[in-house]
Amino acid sequence: MRVIITGGGTGGHVYPALAIARGLKEARPGVELLYIGTARGLEADVVPRAGLTLATITVQGLVRRQVWKNIPALVKTGRGLGEAWQQVRRFRPDVVVGTGGYVSGPVCLAAALQGVPVILHEQNAFPGVTNRLLAILARCVCLTFPEAASRFPRRAKLVTTGLPVRPEIIQADRDSCRQHFGLRPEQLFLVTVGGSQGARSINGAMLPILKELAGCQDVSLLQVTGRRDYEAYLQQVRTQGIDLAKYGNITIEPYVYNLEQALAAADLVIGRAGASFLAEVLARGLPSVLVPYPHAAANHQEYNARAVARQGAAVVVLDRELKGGRLYQVVFELLRSREKLKAMAAAAASLGRPGALEAIIQVILKTVESG
């Protein structure tokens, strides 16, 4: 079996693609995989590191608010379509899997025009423009959120599978992870992950929360600031008179490589509403306070957050509300109500789809078998 996987630009498109690639290798050890991306996106770094062959094509994203700037992008996309055509023709795949991003457009279009079955995966509640345009050419569109269905053409074949998460997220043992962080059984563990984009506003809103929690025996806090803001944030913490060494229940890190351990140990999570992060939070059955990144394309993070909040698994705090103290209010209301946290955790667990990867792999295998 020969499979082309394409998707790029950001982690939201690349990491689900890598999870699918790993799932295909496990399901069909002899599978031949080719990843098609760009030389400038995240995929240029992480795909070779994952042991996959990467081919690149020329493509450039469109500028939505300044149409006149799109002429060079359209020229590059035309060139990219020709390059994608050659890659598909040369590799002769049984199926092409696209996870979104501008690079997947030319690749999936070239495949469809050559009669190769195309399967798409959409990560967000508000689907990306590339997947919406490609949907009528695809054999199947795998959705993370059922709410996304209404934004696709009626002719599109849709199935809700969820978003594949790393096996480590699901397999991490809660008890051993809590021991790793030195937590007592009755102690609540609050984890704040600002994300690579726009962590600064969340960091600033966390300062009064840190001040209130400093020395609290009932709550431990891990805050991940992002590398860019780490030193400046530590200085802000010191300016507020918070002595981290003295109190011991607050840990501030620029980045964590063991996020699966932090999520397994957590009782409440604060973070952005990117699809991959949300899928991991829900797979762990975690209550969350979601602060959508306000500059995400088509405001898709707010759509993601609202979809989870409607089911009772999260509380949404908009970025513009952070300066008004709403994050402080929401966090302490939740920390004071273990029953509320328990109810939100149950709702999150009901939304989590730990079998998402297997469901997507089955869609791919059935498509190949049917020809």
Swiss-Prot record:
Role played: Cell wall formation. Catalyzes the transfer of a GlcNAc subunit on undecaprenyl-pyrophosphoryl-MurNAc-pentapeptide (lipid intermediate I) to form undecaprenyl-pyrophosphoryl-MurNAc-(pentapeptide)GlcNAc (lipid intermediate II).
Q: Report the catalytic activity.
A: di-trans,octa-cis-undecaprenyl diphospho-N-acetyl-alpha-D-muramoyl-L-alanyl-D-glutamyl-meso-2,6-diaminopimeloyl-D-alanyl-D-alanine + UDP-N-acetyl-alpha-D-glucosamine = di-trans,octa-cis-undecaprenyl diphospho-[N-acetyl-alpha-D-glucosaminyl-(1->4)]-N-acetyl-alpha-D-muramoyl-L-alanyl-D-glutamyl-meso-2,6-diaminopimeloyl-D-alanyl-D-alanine + UDP + H(+)
Q: Indicate the principal place this protein occupies in or around the cell.
A: membrane
- Which family is it part of? Belongs to the glycosyltransferase 28 family. MurG subfamily.
What is one process in the GO biological process aspect for this record?
A: lipid glycosylation
**Keywords, alphabetical:** Cell cycle, Cell division, Cell membrane, Cell shape, Cell wall biogenesis/degradation, Glycosyltransferase, Membrane, Peptidoglycan synthesis, Transferase
Instruction: Locate the residues binding UDP-N-acetyl-alpha-D-glucosamine.
Output: 10-12, 124, 166, 196, 301
**Membrane-related topology note:** Peripheral membrane protein
Source taxonomy lineage?
Answer: Bacteria, Bacillati, Bacillota, Clostridia, Moorellales
Has keyword Cell division? yes
Q: In which pathway does it act?
A: Cell wall biogenesis; peptidoglycan biosynthesis
**Which CDD domains does the protein's record reference?**
GT28_MurG (cd03785)
Q: Which HAMAP family match?
A: MurG
Name the record gives this protein = UDP-N-acetylglucosamine--N-acetylmuramyl-(pentapeptide) pyrophosphoryl-undecaprenol N-acetylglucosamine transferase
Which residues does UniProt call coiled coil? none
Annotated disulfide bonds: none
What are its GO cellular component terms?
Answer: plasma membrane
Q: Please indicate which superkingdom the organism of origin belongs to.
A: Bacteria
Subcellular localization is given as: Cell membrane
Q: Name one Pfam family in it.
A: Glyco_transf_28
Q: Which GO terms describe its molecular function?
A: UDP-N-acetyl-D-glucosamine:N-acetylmuramoyl-L-alanyl-D-glutamyl-meso-2,6-diaminopimelyl-D-alanyl-D-alanine-diphosphoundecaprenol 4-beta-N-acetylglucosaminlytransferase activity; undecaprenyldiphospho-muramoylpentapeptide beta-N-acetylglucosaminyltransferase activity
**EC number(s) for this protein?**
2.4.1.227
Q: Which InterPro entries match?
A: GlcNAc_MurG (IPR006009), Glyco_trans_28_C (IPR007235), GlycoTrans_28_N (IPR004276)
